[in-house]
Amino acid sequence: MAIKNYTTTINVNKTIGEIQELLSKHGATAIMTEYSNGNVTGLSFKIMTSKGEVGIRLPSNTDRVLQVLKNQRKNNNQIKDTFDQANKVAWRIIKDWIDAQMAILETEMVEMEQIFLPYVMNNKGQTLYESFKENRILLEDSND
């Protein structure tokens, strides 16, 4: 089965604009787009929480998406496996995920910081997930 949005023709900048609109409508106070060689490589934003302002960096790994497209192309030559297409697909998937999360937020089942907790950045720009992965933070055992 091919990955979601593998046929998208929507320009990355249009998708980034849609993401920015979703985030700003739901409380983002600042949004920054990162680029490398003219390609969007990251999107960070700030939200206000009960503990103060928090920075969040969304995950995007176009190289990994490209590898998935290349692997899937072996079984389906209709799949376009270029870096440009992988970048479009990656950001479209992120946009769809954010859109779904904002729908859950609107039902008041969750708070913004719950949705983006793994992507909250520390003062060095490292996300909570990255710190966890490097064993810099551990969850306490509840059996103690």
Question: What feature does the model see in each segment?
Answer:
Residues 33-36:
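Short beta-strand
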Residues 21, 96, 100:
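Charged/polar, solvent-exposed surface patches and flexible loops
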Residues 10-13, 85:
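Intrinsic disorder
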Residues 17, 39-96:
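Long, continuous compositionally biased terminal/linker segments
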Residues 12-30:
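Amphipathic alpha-helical segments
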Residues 87-90, 100-144:
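Glycine-rich, aromatic-bearing surface loops/beta-hairpins
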Residues 1-7:
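A short, surface-exposed helix-loop junction/capping segment
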